[in-house]
Amino acid sequence: MIIESRIEKGKPVVGMETTVFVHGLPRKEAIELFRRAKEISREKGFQLAVIGILKGKIVAGMSEEELEAMMREGADKVGTREIPIVVAEGKNAATTVSATIFLSRRIGIEVVVTGGTGGVHPGRVDVSQDLTEMSSSRAILVSSGIKSILDVEATFEMLETLEIPLIGFRTDEFPLFFSRKSGRRVPRVENVEEVLKIYETMKEIELEKTLMVLNPVPEEYEVPHDEIERLLEKIELEVEGKEVTPFLLKKLVEMTNGRTLKANLALLEENVKLAGEIAVKLKRS
C-alpha cells in the first residue's frame, strides 16, 4: 500500500493532521503539543497517528524527528485534491482536515482530531476542502468548531446543505474555535456513549458523512468572537489561497498578546483527550 501505516493492529487509534503543527503553531509550541498529545495517548490507552507526507511517502504515525524535519525543510499544505500531486513529485506535505480524514479512512481509522475545521472565507469564493471531504467520508471528527476567521453564517449554512451531522459535546451552541459561543444551536450530547450511538446509527443507515463532535475551548482560555471580529477588521490581507488561514492566525496571536495561541493549545489538548476516549470506547463496542 502507498500509505506507510505504523499503527499497531487491534489498538484504538486517532488520526491527527500535520498542518496544525507545521503551519498552525510556532515550532517550539508545536513540538511541545506533539509530545503532550503522545503522552495523553499513552495515558488513555490509544494510538495517536499523526499523518503527513514525507518526500512523497504517506506516513500514518509520524515520529517527532520526522515532524521536526518537515518543519525545518518546509512542507506544502495539502487537502485531498493535492495528495496525488505531492506524492508523485516526492514532496513534503502537511495534511489538512480533508486530507487527514481521506487518508485515515483508507487505513481503517474512524476517529480524527483537529483544532478547528475550515469553511467559507468572507468576501470571496474560497471554500475549504474540509467541508466537501466531510460530506462524503464517514468518520468521527472531534474539533472546536470552525476557525474563528471564517464567514460563520455561510459556513453554518454550507454544513447544513452538505448534510454534515453536528453534535455539541456538553454544549448547546456551535463553538467558533477560540470562542465558545456563536448563537447557533446544535443538538447536545453529554457523554461518549451518546456520540457512539449516533455514529452507529449513521453506519446502519449507510450515511457517508463525517460526524462533527464539537468540543468548546476551555472557558478560562476563551477569546470572545466579537473581539476576534474587531481584530480581523484591522488586518490587511497580504496573501491568498492556502496561506490565508496561517497568516490570519499568526496575526491574531500578535494582536492578542498570545491569548489565541494559549486558547489553541488548550483546545487541541482537550480535543485529543476526547477523541482518544471515543476511539477507545468505539474499539470496545
Curated annotation (Swiss-Prot):
One annotated GO biological process: nucleobase catabolic process
Ligand binding (substrate): 77, 97, 128-130
Cofactor: Mn(2+)
Keywords, comma-separated and alphabetical: Glycosidase, Hydrolase, Lyase, Manganese, Metal-binding
Keyword Manganese annotated: yes
Domain of life assignment: Bacteria
An annotated Gene Ontology molecular function: pseudouridylate synthase activity
A Pfam family it matches: Indigoidine_A
N-terminal signal peptide: none
A single GO cellular-component term on record: cytoplasm
Main enzyme class: lyase
Annotated binding of Mn(2+), by residue: 126
The keyword Iron appears for this protein: no
UniProt-listed InterPro entries: Indigdn_synthA-like, PsuG
Subunit structure: Homotrimer.
UniProt cross-references to HAMAP family, sorted A to Z: PsiMP_glycosidase (MF_01876)
Function: Catalyzes the reversible cleavage of pseudouridine 5'-phosphate (PsiMP) to ribose 5-phosphate and uracil. Functions biologically in the cleavage direction, as part of a pseudouridine degradation pathway.
Family the entry assigns: Belongs to the pseudouridine-5'-phosphate glycosidase family.
Name of the protein this chain belongs to: Pseudouridine-5'-phosphate glycosidase
Organism from which the protein derives: Thermotoga sp. (strain RQ2)
Taxonomic lineage: Bacteria, Thermotogati, Thermotogota, Thermotogae, Thermotogales
